[in-house]
Amino acid sequence: MTQEKNHKEYLFIREAFIRFLNEIENSQQAWEIMEDIITLRTSFLIDRILDGMHMDFDKALDLLKKHNSFTTEREKRERDILIAAIDNLVDFAAAEEFAMLNELAATEENLSEERQENICEKYNLHYATIENNDVLYAAGIASWWIDQSDESMITYMTQGDERVREWHLSLEGITYPKRDFPSELIPPIEFGCRCYLMTDSTISKVIASIPLIEDMEINPVFSESLATGGRIFSEAHGYFTEKFRNEPHLQDIIIRIKHKLWKQ
């Protein structure tokens, strides 16, 4: 079902991408279509956030409209997660499509439509499938994190199978109080990470575990965590280039999309 969903979403983007190619000589029209593509990609990523948090769209909108009128502390934390996720993922979607545009521009002239579509597919199906899963997983972990008390002991665990990366396995069993748990170790800590956290009532592992973090080479893309109000994909991600940050059309698109989401 997940693969089918990813493919259906790609087909929506592909349709818009073909329109983009047909209007590429018309700069204004092409940018308008690019905004449609970025909006689609953003909506698909936000959908993963809602799925991971077990939240429907109406509840998400209701939370976003609230400011200080929360019924529970959980509602406030859920809203904080939604805001952090949306802020990060609008940027991410725009940066991803800009990376696609740059690859198109870097290829030889008169590239066939099939090869152009292959580039679109690489970003919006193959890469997107992995990214969608990471976003879904980050949201699920964030939702679980909300329910843990600050005093609870959190232990890092792997799936324990042959697919586990060695350096992930080296982290298994590391335990901290929630209040001290490093954001860098809240899954996902890398693309395609399947590690998870569990509560542990014992404190015996903690003293031995805490010094380890200082010597670890953590993937900088995942140095923050949605669970603690950070970004899923940090500024270290290859999409977030200086060229992207300085492209005025893209920054205007980002502002408009965020405004629409907050206004809802």
Please give the residue ranges for each predicted region:
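Active-site acidic/histidine clusters and adjacent loop/turn architecture
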Residues: 91-154
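Conserved short secondary-structure elements within globular domains
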Residues: 128-192, 196-203
